Each structure stands twice: as structure tokens, then as C-alpha cells.
Amino acid sequence: MPLRIIREDLTKIKCDAIVNPTNVNLVPGGGIDAAVHVAAGPDLFTACQRLGGLEVGQVKMTPAYNLPCKHIFHTVGPWWEGGHKNEKEKLQECYRNSLLLAESLKLKSLALPLISSEIGRAHV
């Protein structure tokens, strides 16, 4: 899968899947997560509740509903605490697990935002 860096609204990208940085309870939060939930519609909230939560670095998938992509990969990035609690490794897990899921599904395109860069304050 070739790499391309773009600046675009994640909720408007036509691709196989987008990665949605969320929280451990998969309830609409702020930042990208809020925008994804608004654009996808109320069915996304129901689907997220069925997933039963996430751990930091874990990735789970839902349909994209009203988004132009096919799937949403939900992941929880680490909260930056000075770099002393394996935040770098946990952040790498978010990206690695997203890419591994995309590969297992044989996806051709995946839109990845900067995870934990807004609310989690990670140094990326």
C-alpha cells in the first residue's frame, strides 16, 4: 500500500477504511471522534456500543454508515504523560494494529490521522 500524506477532512475521504481515534468506552468524544460520529450518523453509536470497549492500542471495526469509506477502524491512543509510561510503544500499536487489520482484510486504502495529537497531547 503506497503512502500519501494529505490534509483533508477524514470524514470526506473516499477509501476502504478510516482510523478513528476514540476513547476506551467508544462513546463520541471530541476532535476527530466527534466529527466521525456526526458524519456517520446515529447507527455508528449503536455499533460502537456492541463492540464492548477498547484498550489502548487495540483496534476494532464497524461499518462506515453515512461516510464515503467502507469501514471505520476505532483505536484508543495513549495519553501523553511525559514519555515514562510506554506512550510511544502504545501509539505505535495503534498504527501497527490498524495496518495489520487493513492487510488482513486486503484493503487497498486506509486513511490514518495523527492519533493522540489533539486530545492525548502525544508528541508526534
Task: Annotate each language-model stretch with its function.
Residues 1-7:
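N-terminal and secondary-structure boundary signal
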Residues 4, 46-70:
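N-terminal short beta-loop-beta anion/metal-coordinating cradle
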Residues 8-52, 56:
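Short, conserved "active-site rim" segments that organize catalytic pockets and cofactor/ligand binding
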Residues 16, 70, 108:
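Conserved acidic residues
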Residues 67-81:
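Short, basic/glycine-rich phosphate-binding loops at helix/coil junctions
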Residues 79-121:
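Phosphate/ribose-phosphate-bearing ligand recognition and processing surfaces
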